[in-house]
Amino acid sequence: KGKRWGYFPSFSAGWIFTEEDFMKDNDWISFGKLRASWGQNGNQSISNFIYSSNISYLPQGYYFGPDKLVTSPTAIPANVPNPDVTWETSEQLNIGLDARFFKSNLGLSFDYYNKMTKDWLVLAPILGTAGAGAPYINGGDIKNSGIEFTLNWKGKVSDFIYGASFSGTMNRNEVTRLANAEGIINGSSDVLSQGTASISRVEVGFPIGFFYGLKTDGLLQNQDDVDAYLTPEGKPYFEDLRPGDVKFIDQNLDGLINDDDKVMLGSPLPDFEMGIQLNAEYKGVYANATLVGKFGMQVMQSYRSFADNFTQNYTTQIFGRWHGEGTSNRIPRLGYASTRNINLISDIYMHDADFVRISNVVLGYRFNELLRNVKWIKGASVYTSVNNLYTFTRYDGMDPDVGYAPDSWASGVDLGLYP
């Protein structure tokens, strides 16, 4: 109540400087405009009644702790209500330039943006003793800032018409506030395999949904490596170490490999995204091509943990496992008694996922010239197209451009499924 409506103002202004007297006599710039805007938007893409709680009917009763305390049919709140939840508001500043040069053959568009998302709507982690699911809260603030640009050229040589466009985006994402004491929200567990900790995290000062786990220093190649892998007190980190095991890094040098040694492993958010559009036409024959690319992001290959299990099938990458000194420094030995190598979340699952993809190619022919005397047909064409023709990447998974994650704010988990 009292939060069913919102007020979200916006302002914009522009200056077409090529219409000024001091620009009238130039012959190299056809159009130029400086612009700026500021505005707010409220997020309405949310479920209804998130401030309240539905009632769940449990015909078989429910568990609370180790004992089944309620054995008869019952009804419980599905989640903890939050009557104070309110709008998620995005506040954005844009400063840009639009320009065309050389009789409008060359075009340029440039934008700087600074966007602050306030009162981020997120499911709040709660203790199991709450007896119901997590409520939605206004959990924090997230900042996105960067630049966007587009550069295009069009030209004509006799009957040959051609054009090219290049666009790019550089974005920096940072969580600036979280509405809990720790300033941290951990993602879902059991993502890589049953019993594993969360792989994604939200933390103040870091990009949203970054990957979190243990750093490694390769594999123990021989018994000398095993004997040398000791704590500061000179004791083995694990009693059952063997050649082919992962060498986890003790970040704080406390003699233990645990959650205190976990650090940022990477981010599923790219540093730079680009797009290229090419087109050409000659006497009715035309061709178009679209390329897209992303750079500076990482992917967590979750399917590896399932593949490295005796009860599941294997991928061909298992042939690159450690099976003797020098055979691998990334994929550990196969083992049944100890699952530490694959169950501890570490950078052995992390991969750079830079790529450039030919996303679309079209080849066609226009019959406009042949049909110019047919009054009841304005135009016709025949064409063939190919989508996702080829991806240039060093990533060895199925698809580097994965968006899956079990949490709405996370991404970049590769399940090894068909794209």
Task: Describe the predicted segments one by one.
Residues 1, 17-19, 38-42, 112-118, ...:
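Transmembrane beta-strands of outer-membrane beta-barrel pores
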Residues 11-15, 95-99, 110, 149-153, ...:
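Residues on the lipid-exposed face of transmembrane beta-strands in outer-membrane beta-barrel proteins
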Residues 30-34, 95, 106-108, 162-164, ...:
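Transmembrane beta-strands of outer-membrane beta-barrel proteins
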Residues 50, 137, 154-266, 387, ...:
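Conserved small-residue
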Residues 56, 60-63, 139-144, 190-221, ...:
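C-terminal beta-signal and terminal closure region of outer-membrane beta-barrel proteins
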Residues 62-107, 135-157, 205-213, 267-272, ...:
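Outer-membrane beta-barrel signature, preferentially recognizing the C-terminal barrel domain
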Residues 221, 238, 243, 294-389:
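Extracytoplasmic gating/loop element in the C-terminal half of outer-membrane beta-barrel translocons
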